[in-house]
Amino acid sequence: MSSQPFWDERIHRWRCLGSEGNELIYIDEEQTWKDYDPNSLKMNKAGSTGAEVSDVTAEATEGKESSNGEDRHTKRLYESTSAEGYPSGSRNKKSKSENSEASPAPVINKAVYIQGLPLDVTVDEIEEVFKKCGVIAKNIDNGTPRIKIYRTEDGTPKGDALIVFFRSESVELAEQLFDDTEFRYGSGQKMRVQKANIDYKKEKTVNKDVGGALKKKALRLRQQQMQQISSWDDVDEEVDDKRKKRFNKIVVLKHIFTLEELDKTPELLIDLKDDITEEAEKCGRVTNVVLYDKEPDGVVTVRFSNNEEAEACVRLMQGRYFDGRVVEASIYDGKVRFQKSGKHTLDDEEDEEKRLEKFADWLENSN
């Protein structure tokens, strides 16, 4: 019966006693057990140095390991040997390599492929249109945008192109904004915008083995693009602040009516407007109430003189029942354009409110 393998520090190999009483040694390079012969040239080539062979020869004359030593090595074995009887170091190395091959790092797609472009389109035109989706990546060597217009062998544009963005989020935005739209308005020719095949990464024009100067240039270019993104965020925040100040006095109420009710009773609009005005005035001065008779959600907007009154109205109306329906109340975000009969819009209401305020000021000053 074979003994448990143990680690031999002198030759830096695993050893054990075979079933026939012969000594075995584990060869990492071949991942197998072989007969141990300290004088063998083959063993010397397998990893033992001349000094190690001398030590092993001396060990052979001294006899086998003592029982205490074997117990000690056996304990070490249980901590570092796999269930199949192989040294865990060799097995782990193999497992790690297998795992790395089985689970490659996820590839991030930052490019879109566009079809249906005008044949005379230029890189500048494409950049001008698609920069609305985010920062377009730059070529490190010359700083030009990473936009490739595909051409035939004689140099004629084929009507398709590739754009590489700085951030992956721009890809989805480009699809949403421009897929099935005209590149040039009125041309009748619609684009097809979709995620690019990941093989585009093989088309990079800069060698990976770049010098230090080019690496610094790449880092500087990346910092500039990050600053550009940051400045866009600042602009977006500024626009959001202005929008909030402009529309935070308007409350949107939903589920006040149904389109079927309005069809059956057109005069219901007047009654609803009076009822809502009366209820909303509990929160402050109401300057305008508009019912959007083309909205299936039964939308009504109420404009107050300030934001505090509008917030109070939201608290009052949110979740209340109106003719058997639960009312949704919120501050208008300025993004949605509700539909109603005629051309009257929220912007028209604001202009009308300004005119009324000026007229009120004129009356006060004239007196």
UniProtKB/Swiss-Prot annotation:
GO molecular function, one term: RNA binding
PROSITE patterns registered for this protein in UniProt: RRM
Biased composition (Basic and acidic residues): 61-78
Gene3D superfamilies assigned: 3.30.70.330
Gene Ontology cellular-component annotations: U2 snRNP; U2-type spliceosomal complex
Pfam families: RRM_1
Membrane-traversing stretches: none
InterPro entries: Nucleotide-bd_a/b_plait_sf (IPR012677), RBD_domain_sf (IPR035979), RRM_dom (IPR000504), TatSF1-like (IPR034393), TatSF1-like_RRM1 (IPR034392)
GO BP terms: mRNA cis splicing, via spliceosome
Ranges for domain RRM: 112-193, 268-329
Keyword terms, alphabetized: mRNA processing, mRNA splicing, Repeat, RNA-binding
Residue numbers spanned by region Disordered: 36-104
Listed PANTHER family: HIV TAT-SPECIFIC FACTOR 1, SPLICING FACTOR U2AF-ASSOCIATED PROTEIN 2
Biological function: Has a role in pre-mRNA splicing.
Subunit structure of this chain's protein: Interacts with the U2AF large and U2AF small subunits.
UniProt similarity note: Belongs to the HTATSF1 family.
Entry protein name: Splicing factor U2AF-associated protein 2
Species name: Schizosaccharomyces pombe (strain 972 / ATCC 24843)
